[in-house]
Amino acid sequence: LNALKVLVVCPAIAKSVWVDQLKKWGHAYSTYKVLRGLTPASTFWASNEVGTPAFTISNYDILAGRRASRKQKGGGFATSEYSGWADALVAWKPDLLILDEAHAVKNKSAARTAAVAKIAAASKARLALTGTPVWNKLLDIHGLMDVLFPGAFGTKFQFAQAYMEPIHNGYGWEYIGVNKLRLEELQRRLTFYMLSRKKVDVLKELPAKTRVIVPVEDIQWDTSRHGEEDDD
């Protein structure tokens, strides 16, 4: 692949994990940057770094631009515009785009999905990592695949017509169920794009379980305990 410029997009909480693993395994990459904030620098990679192996890590929520309003002391509201990182990363043209927890872009109408789609179109190669490609309904997989391979499964409506069952909700028709007669066809088409493995199939090939101790603040521990009590 010869990917000199690699971009990882992940949940914010996973950015430090990627940094730790990059330091441990990514010896081929001489430098890395972790993106923060909603307003990027005009050039976040210096000119003397162009052409060297570079790794960039971002979270989904800072890619899309947004408008934020805050109340002023004297009354009224002040509005700020934030551009987001998407355009800067499109201009950077990654050799490889990695989407961690890729089901985050299953919703085509979300701003983050549109931002990731722009970056994906500018990337030479794309890799999506997720254990739950279908979160709630089958259309989730169409949203994800359309970011990675635009048009490969037709429009959202065409996909629903082909692989889902219409259900009348009392007001109109919506596509929720699965067309079992064409499920095997869909699975066959997806194998061209996806690599899926069950734990039972690869358990013997996996290393021994590793336990990692993660330090937390008192408030995090208290919140976790209260959450468990609520579940009970």
Task: Give the residues covered by each predicted segment.
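A short helix-turn-beta junction within AAA+ P-loop NTPase domains corresponding to the substrate/partner-engaging
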Residues: 141-154
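Conserved helicase ATPase motor motifs in RecA-like P-loop NTPase domains
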Residues: 124-137
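Walker A/P-loop NTP-binding motif
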Residues: 1-3, 115-117, 147-148
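Conserved helix/coil segment N-terminal to the catalytic DExD/H
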Residues: 39-55, 61-93
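Conserved helix-turn-beta segment of the N-terminal RecA-like "Helicase ATP-binding" lobe
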Residues: 14-39, 148-150
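Inter-lobe coupling linker of SF2 helicases/translocases
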Residues: 57-63, 81-91, 110-124, 153-232
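Walker B catalytic acidic pair
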Residues: 100-101
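Conserved Walker A/P-loop ATP-binding site and its immediately adjacent core
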Residues: 3-24, 135-140
